[in-house]
Amino acid sequence: MSFSRSAADPADTLPDLAATLAAPGDDAFVALGDAFHTRLPAAPLPAPYVVGFSAEVAQLLGLPPSLAAHAQFAELFAGNPTRDWPAHALPYASVYSGHQFGVWAGQLGDGRALTIGELPGSDGRRYELQLKGGGRTPYSRMGDGRAVLRSSIREYLCSEAMHHLGIPTTRALTVIGSDQPVVREEIETSAVVTRVSESFVRFGHFEHFFSNDRPDLLRRLADHVIERFYPACREADDPYLALLEAAMLRTADMVAQWQAVGFCHGVMNTDNMSILGVTIDYGPFGFVDAFDANHICNHSDTSGRYAYRMQPRIAHWNCYCLAQALLPLIGLQHGIGDDDARAERAVDDAQAVLAKFPERFGPALERAMRAKLGLELEREHDAELANQLLETMHASHADFTLTFRRLAQLSKHDASRDAPVRDLFIDRAAFDAWANLYRARLSEETRDDAARAAAMNRVNPKYVLRNHLAEVAIRRAKDKDFSEVERLAQILRRPFDEQPEHEPYAALPPDWAGSLEVSCSS
């Protein structure tokens, strides 16, 4: 059954959409079998209303932008029944395990997320739609299965902001709110965010079947991921080793992009790592304001495990966990000697792959930093120059986003134009010393100041989702004013443009922003 993208009347569209969601392809995750998921209806969300809607994501899914005006739109994406769902087509929650804060946590799973199906995208790919906050599942443990308005708005906005920064990420179609109260650190109201991704398979899915000694199911999962998302691995000498390497390289690239924009994920547990190398699970994230290499965005992270500077190391560690989970599959097709010999060879092969992480991450970050500095030519000491800037920023707590954006205004020959960026530094002499090194390096470039500035402004965003901007939108949304959610979403879709009418959104955070805290409570 197919969804008609040309339907002119939203009233005709919604039933077709529900039917299409209920009819996944034969190679969908849900087709792997009951050992991978549990089907169950979402918990009804009373009196739902639309808080935010991305027409851009709707178009990606082949849906008309007018869809949000449908009377039953909020009902469907709140998880409320809009039709009689047969048992074989109910939403499902998947099971996985994982390491949380470096400690084996055992079985986890979608404790409040329900996948309602998949839709064909306008780009030729297929996308799963998942309701985060859809109610309790068999994997909820002590949770209530709900998400709150605060965290749902943050995830909705950041998913789209990251996409427009060019960073691999899940997307967000809509946020649906309700006045239903839920208890967190205080009483809040419920919401559901519809997440969109080609797949929600995590490192933790592989860890689950490894830890339960189910190599048959582990192989079924790996074959699914290879067939659908990494087809080139099929032709490799060892497809499962190739899968490890492909996922690891994507992860390294993703984290390099995080570092380049000052993004902190906040909770890089293995169950929050996508096998596709996309950013997933926006919880206690944050963009660094006053730069601190040791910045911790999650106040639940008392040890600083997931601090900004630690993210590359943790990503690498997580890849080790993925490698361990894949060991029973690596080398299977070679049939090398007995099981002990094969296992020993698998460990050696996996170690060789894992050694490539820094080889991938380092150059990826260097390329990003070279672009941020407007350096077109490659020179031996460029990485050192970038690191010296970061150290100078760290010492002065200079704003990360504004420093790189304003650096474009610096002239090769005229230090009098340094003021906009220089004023961000407490230690002006330290900045001047670095700026002299930078000018010397710029003298080797062929581009003039204007061309360099234009190039820098294409990679250094002016607008990012700072915590205080999200907080203002959340506070207004609690009063049923969703205009700031929409305004902020529109601004963040053009992060590199000047947008002079929105200049306050690019300013330094106000003093009150320093008291904001985000945690795993969502």
UniProtKB/Swiss-Prot annotation:
Binding site for ATP: G109, G111, R112, K132, D144, G145, R195, R202, D281
Keyword annotations: ATP-binding, Magnesium, Manganese, Metal-binding, Nucleotide-binding, Nucleotidyltransferase, Transferase
Source organism, top-level taxon: Bacteria
List of residues binding Mg(2+): N272, D281
Catalytic activity: L-seryl-[protein] + ATP = 3-O-(5'-adenylyl)-L-seryl-[protein] + diphosphate; L-threonyl-[protein] + ATP = 3-O-(5'-adenylyl)-L-threonyl-[protein] + diphosphate; L-tyrosyl-[protein] + ATP = O-(5'-adenylyl)-L-tyrosyl-[protein] + diphosphate; L-histidyl-[protein] + UTP = N(tele)-(5'-uridylyl)-L-histidyl-[protein] + diphosphate
GO terms for MF: AMPylase activity; ATP binding; magnesium ion binding
Entry-linked InterPro entries: SelO
Reported cofactor(s): Mg(2+); Mn(2+)
Positions of the catalytic residues: D271 (proton acceptor)
Enzyme Commission number(s): 2.7.7.-, 2.7.7.108
Family, per entry: Belongs to the SELO family.
Function: Nucleotidyltransferase involved in the post-translational modification of proteins. It can catalyze the addition of adenosine monophosphate (AMP) or uridine monophosphate (UMP) to a protein, resulting in modifications known as AMPylation and UMPylation.
Protein name: Protein nucleotidyltransferase YdiU
Designated gene of the protein: ydiU
